[in-house]
A protein has these predicted regions:
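Hydrophobic anchor at the start of a short beta-strand
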Residues: 20, 33, 43, 209
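Helix-loop-beta segment of a Rossmann-like dinucleotide-binding subdomain
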Residues: 69-70, 98-109, 135-179, 270-274
Length: 291
């Protein structure tokens, strides 16, 4: 340890340097920590609140793919992530001895227009080329959807999956700890630069810094790069005490219905570009449930 004098008195600062420091303990930051620790890097994760306290600690958890036609690099990247997710979460949950709620349950989507029906038939063929063992089928009906809501049948894909976001964060964090990752919760970073982060608590040093602090991190990134980096979008969802087991998730009219493995079902979500309070629930959620 060494003592460093500043305007507020003496601060105690470690001389330890990490290979990687990650700002933010949401799903992206935790995933980076897990990947780095698996490669034997020393990792420190800091968060201004608790693990999974932001959008990553939500309840929706729909993991759904792009359509299998008009294939390009972005779709291939997402496909590789989704197709490998099952093995990934099995390993994470085994290491943590917790459940992320992951399950490849598939997805059904009602077809209400003939044009969409014809597109779906074409995508069925494209999936054979681009999706490997996973399918994009057109089916006549499903027990969860009334025939009047699906006049042209339904799309059924077997690539989609569910996860319980807040539980996934806890499972991933526990797995990271098993691998030696260090965590500092309730530790707000007010400044970062190459090789260093700092706050009222002191400073830490790392060869690489990853900023994964959600929409709140954009302000710091805007200042660091001197260009607008992004903004946050708020989503509201409802958790219902309805047990649908391992039924496929439903996507219709911009709304997801996701059955979870704990016997609950989530409906979501809103998409709000203009908002003032991130955790407030309002009439928009009621409107979504009514739909």
């Amino acid at each position: 340890m060494k003592l460093k004098f500043n305007a507020h008195g003496f601060r105690m600062t470690t001389t330890k340097s990490y290979d990687v420091i990650i700002i933010g303990a949401g799903i992206f930051g935790l995933s980076c920590a897990y990947a780095c620790s698996k490669r034997n890097f020393s990792v420190l994760v800091v968060d201004s609140n608790k693990i999974g306290s932001g959008a990553s600690g939500g309840i929706l958890g729909a993991m759904a793919p792009y359509t299998p036609d008009q294939w390009h690099v972005k779709k291939e990247y997402q496909f590789q992530a989704l197709s490998s997710a099952e093995a990934h979460w099995i390993k994470v949950d085994k290491l943590s001895n917790l459940s992320s709620g992951y399950g490849r349950i598939g997805r059904i989507s009602p077809i209400i227009h003939e044009r969409v029906y014809n597109l779906a038939l074409n995508r069925h063929e494209e999936a054979k080329i681009n999706w490997g063992k996973f399918k994009w089928d057109v089916i006549e009906s499903h027990d969860l959807v009334s025939p009047s809501s699906a006049p042209f049948g339904l799309i059924h894909d077997t690539l989609s999956a569910r996860i319980y976001p807040s539980r996934a964060c806890l499972s991933l964090a526990r797995a990271c700890r098993v691998l030696g990752v260090e965590f500092r919760e309730n530790t707000k970073v007010t400044n970062f630069q190459t090789g260093m982060i700092s706050g009222s608590w002191g400073q830490e040093f790392g060869a690489s810094i990853i900023v994964a602090s959600g929409y709140e991190g954009f302000e710091s990134l805007d200042e660091y790069f001197n260009i607008p980096m992004g903004s946050g979008v708020k989503g509201q969802a409802a958790l219902l005490d309805i047990n649908l087991g391992d039924a496929p998730q439903i996507y219709a009219d911009g709304v997801y219905i996701v059955p979870h493995d704990d016997g609950t079902t989530t409906i979501g979500s809103t998409s709000e570009k203009n908002w003032s309070k991130p955790s407030n629930i309002d009439f928009q959620l009621e409107e979504l449930i009514d739909r």
